[in-house]
């Protein structure tokens, strides 16, 4: 039976922290810019690590994402060597970088929900005004 927190999960969390520090302090590639390491998945044999990253530029497009991932991929050997000196592992995993879409998708869904709520409130207000306009006419007819 697998434990709730297996060794691969613990190693993945530690690798995530170390890579975040390395990217913040050591890697000076302008293509990368401000990057956040959102998750790391390590293979069971600890030979490979999928590193999920998010770029923090406001005007990010597919071209800049590809450029940032290319910069990270080219710096993967350097990051791996720094990771090896920071952690005690028999084999330091080969790093593979992927763009994490969850933040972008979360913001898109949040905007959709906000727009829907705003539209519903507007429709309710318009429907309320129509009822209010119809109601005074009905009361004047009753008095006459």
Curated annotation (Swiss-Prot):
One of its GO terms (biological process) is maturation of SSU-rRNA. Its main location: cytoplasm. Keywords: Cytoplasm, Ribosome biogenesis. Pfam families: RBFA. It comes from the Bacteria. InterPro entries: KH_dom-like_a/b, RbfA, RbfA_dom_sf, Ribosome-bd_factorA_CS. GO terms for molecular function: ribosomal small subunit binding. GO terms for cellular component: cytosol. SUPFAM superfamilies: Ribosome-binding factor A, RbfA. It is found in: Cytoplasm. Belongs to the RbfA family. NCBIfam families: rbfA. Monomer. Binds 30S ribosomal subunits, but not 50S ribosomal subunits or 70S ribosomes. The keyword Lipoprotein does not apply. One of several proteins that assist in the late maturation steps of the functional core of the 30S ribosomal subunit. Associates with free 30S ribosomal subunits (but not with 30S subunits that are part of 70S ribosomes or polysomes). Required for efficient processing of 16S rRNA. May interact with the 5'-terminal helix region of 16S rRNA. Residues 120-144 are annotated as: Disordered. Residues 129-144 have a biased composition (Acidic residues). HAMAP family: RbfA (MF_00003). This is Ribosome-binding factor A.
